[in-house]
Amino acid sequence: MASAYDLTNLSNLKTWLDIAGSEDDLLLSQLITQISRAILNILDRPSILPGNYLETYDGGNECSIILRQWPVNSVSLCGVNGVPIPPSPPIDAGAAFQAGFVLDGADSAPPGRMQRLSLRGRRFTVGVQNVQVSYLAGYQITGEAAMAPQAPPYAMSVLAPYGDWASDGGVAYANGVALSPVAGNPIAGQYVVQNGVYTFAPSDAGAALNITYGYVPADLAVCCMDWAAERYAYRSRIGQQSKSLGGQETMAFIVKDVPDFVAAALQPYRRLVTP
């Protein structure tokens, strides 16, 4: 069974390797999961898909802290010494600011960057484990505009501009009313999603929708496939650093824990600061 943390899928890897048969499907699936976990460890990130985090920090009388996960999609709680801090609305010209928390904006495309949570009108006062923040973070397309298909089978794929669909974040009508996910046979106000394909009820045909979903950045998916392909090929030359070809020439193999091309591509996604 595929792991929720896999950075690619079996079908994509087999296409990458130009493999048609199924004899090595189990091995390739295991490689995907192992390499995906190794990549997340290198990045020092528990996951790259949208998830909820509740984190505790030591206050140091600063105005800002750097949240540990990114990109941050929303903050549901900011508390100091047990006192909830409300969000501070944008500052209008000529108007006084309102005290509260402010989140740095996220980059529109991956890899993104770690974001600050700042306070207006107060500080993260000195204390041990006295600051709590609850937030949603991970690579996500929020509110992608779409129209429910008007012809059978009433199914559509998301645009996925930065990488393959990986998790559902909900569907809502343009007026903000949420649709409910179901396992099959949707009726009005319901939808089915599988591998990034959304299916709606005939009665919702033509409805204006906003779709939210998590995705795996294409860079990370390619890194996973490149590294898995390298490990798959390594089976035929385990322990070898070179091989003589008929005594006329020698083929040398580069044996490294992380291939150079993978390490370079992963660098922009790594956590460089541990707050």
What would you call each of these model-derived segments?
Residues M1-P275:
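Divalent metal-cofactor coordination and adjacent catalytic microenvironments
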